[in-house]
Amino acid sequence: MAGIAIKLAKDREAAEGLGSHERAIKYLNQDYETLRNECLEAGALFQDPSFPALPSSLGYKELGPYSSKTRGIEWKRPTEICADPQFIIGGATRTDICQGALGDCWLLAAIASLTLNEEILARVVPPDQSFQENYAGIFHFQFWQYGEWVEVVVDDRLPTKDGELLFVHSAEGSEFWSALLEKAYAKINGCYEALSGGATTEGFEDFTGGIAEWYELRKPPPNLFKIIQKALEKGSLLGCSIDITSAADSEAVTYQKLVKGHAYSVTGAEEVESSGSLQKLIRIRNPWGQVEWTGKWNDNCPSWNTVDPEVRANLTERQEDGEFWMSFSDFLRHYSRLEICNLTPDTLTCDSYKKWKLTKMDGNWRRGSTAGGCRNYPNTFWMNPQYLIKLEEEDEDEEDGERGCTFLVGLIQKHRRRQRKMGEDMHTIGFGIYEVPEELTGQTNIHLGKNFFLTTRARERSDTFINLREVLNRFKLPPGEYVLVPSTFEPHKDGDFCIRVFSEKKADYQAVDDEIEANIEEIDANEEDIDDGFRRLFVQLAGEDAEISAFELQTILRRVLAKRQDIKSDGFSIETCKIMVDMLDEDGSGKLGLKEFYILWTKIQKYQKIYREIDVDRSGTMNSYEMRKALEEAGFKLPCQLHQVIVARFADDELIIDFDNFVRCLVRLETLFKIFKQLDPENTGTIQLNLASWLSFSVL
């Protein structure tokens, strides 16, 4: 229940703007300004208690407390490492980022790309920090985390060995912004070792809040040139690189002056007429040197003489140092990988860009209720969360004659790096997209069931199920309604996720879920209508006071269930018997009279019938995935979040719900619905309670 309250509070804060870049969430409630001022007033340097200068901050296995790699490590402040430490010298550049003894080259490549754009760098690395003015041993950075911007505070104690920084360091040795940025990122992910292994796109996204896609240029999609042009129009960050096959290859220069293992940026894509035919050209920037392409379409290439002088001047006169043009075919031949980070509208301050439309939806998989696994598990796949996508407007221009609506889908699993310390790692994740059948279009309150997925093929799906933080794909579909189903590969895997959809045109997205509904069959009973046989049974069971208490009810039901072979049960707990009595005890006596007992007896017989019918394997029990169908048979339609709560409350460790817990759940639900209905006679869907009333109902 605490988790639900926290989620509701977070939703309200997000609606008020908390989590935007301007109102970043204070990680672990640490406020940079407050902590720095406290240190300045006390004349002390900040020591971060939440990420201490101890082995636990380094790692858990290879960098664990007893690892040979962590022997002899000392934590030192930059003022202890060199005579004149600087935060940033002459702007952030690639040479500020040299890899240390940690396998986080993916992160460093993303940081290197970040230095190409000063405006975006300043969003992550606030520039007003130094080791001179108002120095208090504290620094702060901002990262995007699953739809929210988070401000992370660190002290400047850094791990060293033999007087040298152990991890990221600058070539000059006196510049520390990159080492402190790495430390802040390690903190938000649990420890330094958690950063080992990853994809550059992960860093791209956490530094920009964008959605990053990448292409192997050996197998480019046929419309890649158009994708690049559109990305540039939208202000996206584009990077390309040439793979290296060994450490010796790093920074090696090819015969046509391209540098291997080097992060280049793509800054232009144009088609020009040359000798009567159209040539596709790509403009590339090498921001860290004068080494430029010497192949066709370089600055001095005769091919430029075949281009209209005005076009040539327009393309070449505005080039910056290190920029050069090359043909698109040469680009595909020489470069290995292209990465595109599509930025969110709030990141782009220039109005000239055509901005993406962005939607983010959060969800979770919970073992036993909404963690259904992939299509290989048809009995549970349908129970995964479902999201409706309404594509209404086609793109303005066609790509290769294909009309439709372009959109990107990114499925991110949350906080998995942070859980590596506990032995967890990335789940294998993916998603499918299904066309909504015509008879269901326009409806958002129907969770598609098992039969739909048994008879319907996915219209699109993620390229693969993979154990990375994010699975991302670009699609183009005709206008219409589609349902997106994210899942882990195997069922029963707990996890939180967010889905982001970037679309060229406005589109609607929302969770698909059953509306809350209770169609409870009312049992009309007058004492005169109750047959004599039941009356005699009641007198025999109730005794002299002609009423049945919860304790007497427990004894009665235990005898009844002991005779049944088709339902496994140890009888009813006293708690279940008490809530059954509470549900029907209208006079407040704490006991059931003849009429009340008759109604309860009728309900229990109905519950038994449902339990047997849902138990298709005749095990005498019900698993948690069958519970959803059983609740529907009993008249309840509930959203996924409530199914998660029910499984957590009423299923055992093996996801079995016995008859006692099944009945307790149904009685609890019926009681809550009745209370709500009595307090909301106008059917507004809302009630108001003071604290005393809330507590009274909560302890039912």
Curated annotation (Swiss-Prot):
Residues annotated to bind Ca(2+) 3: 89, 91, 96, 175
Main EC class the enzyme belongs to: hydrolase
Residue ranges constituting the Calpain catalytic domain according to the UniProt record: 45-344
Chain sites annotated for binding Ca(2+) 4: 292, 299, 319, 323
Cofactor(s), by name: Ca(2+)
Ranges for region Linker: 515-529
Domain of life of the source: Eukaryota
Main location: cytoplasm
Residues reported to bind Ca(2+) 2: 229-230
GO MF term set: calcium ion binding; calcium-dependent cysteine-type endopeptidase activity; cytoskeletal protein binding; enzyme binding; peptidase activity; protein-containing complex binding
Modified residues (N-acetylalanine): 2
Residues that, per the record, bind Ca(2+) 7: 615, 617, 619, 621, 626
Start and end residues of each stretch annotated as Domain III: 345-514
Annotated spans, Domain IV: 530-700
Domain (EF-hand): residue spans on this chain: 572-605, 602-637
Family: Belongs to the peptidase C2 family.
Protein name as catalogued: Calpain-2 catalytic subunit
Gene (name only): Capn2
